[in-house]
């Protein structure tokens, strides 16, 4: 497996993505965008991109969120940075669409077989990309926020949507899940949502416990493994 930092522009920022692929493979293969948690492109999203490349043979791009591959260090910084991304569709969509363009420009990538995944706010970003009408086969969110900027655009979604949540995640209440399901259902989207019992936020991140708020964010090995398998199964379905 090989990795490389690639540069692309989005929303006036110099984005630095983390590309991973199997250099021994020949011919174009599926590509996967990996959108990170709200703190930015760190080891969690990078390691997931590398795992996709190593285990599945796809080309995976860990996507920058804040420019310069910056990592935020406090919840106050995160809330400030996310405010415009949650309220101005053009800002969040520039980050997703331009990352897609950077990935599909690679000769190793089959531009007709692309999916987007994301963790926490990164999962929201995968849905935002789908809402642009981008030609992606699937948008997958792990413990992802469901409050998208333009729910009225759900009819533009071309691929399948898979949402993987902790049933006890305090940040994603039942009413938010219901509204998201209604949005997708009304638009005729092929969607799935799985709830993991007794699981809260950030269940895929082994370092979630460092937050020190186990009632909110906590790693769960079983939910991590189950959600990864569901992602792999959907890739097999949509990529053929």
Predicted features, each with a name:
Residues 1-240:
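N-terminal cap/leader regions of alpha/beta-hydrolase-fold enzymes
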């Amino acid at each position: 497996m090989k990795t490389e930092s690639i540069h692309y522009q989005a929303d006036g920022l110099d984005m630095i993505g983390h590309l991973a692929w199997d250099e021994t493979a020949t011919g174009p293969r599926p590509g996967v965008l990996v959108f990170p948690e709200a703190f930015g492109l760190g080891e969690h999203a990078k390691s997931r991109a590398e795992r996709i490349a190593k285990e599945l043979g796809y080309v995976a791009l860990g996507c920058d969120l804040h420019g310069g591959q910056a990592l935020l260090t406090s919840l106050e910084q995160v809330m400030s940075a996310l405010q415009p991304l949650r309220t101005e569709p053009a800002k969040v969509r520039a980050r997703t669409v331009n990352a897609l363009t950077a990935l599909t420009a690679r000769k190793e990538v089959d531009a007709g077989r692309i999916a987007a995944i994301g963790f926490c706010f990164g999962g929201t970003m995968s849905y935002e990309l789908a809402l642009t009408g981008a030609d992606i086969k699937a948008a997958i969110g792990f413990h992802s926020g469901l409050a998208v900027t333009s729910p009225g655009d759900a009819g533009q979604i071309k691929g399948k949507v898979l949402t993987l949540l902790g049933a006890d995640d305090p940040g994603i209440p039942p009413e938010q899940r219901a509204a998201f399901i209604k949005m997708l259902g009304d638009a005729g989207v092929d969607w799935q949502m799985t709830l993991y019992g007794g699981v809260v936020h950030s269940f895929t991140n082994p370092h979630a416990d460092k937050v020190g708020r186990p009632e909110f964010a906590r790693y769960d090995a079983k939910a991590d493994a189950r959600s990864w398998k569901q992602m792999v199964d959907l890739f097999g379905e949509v990529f053929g």
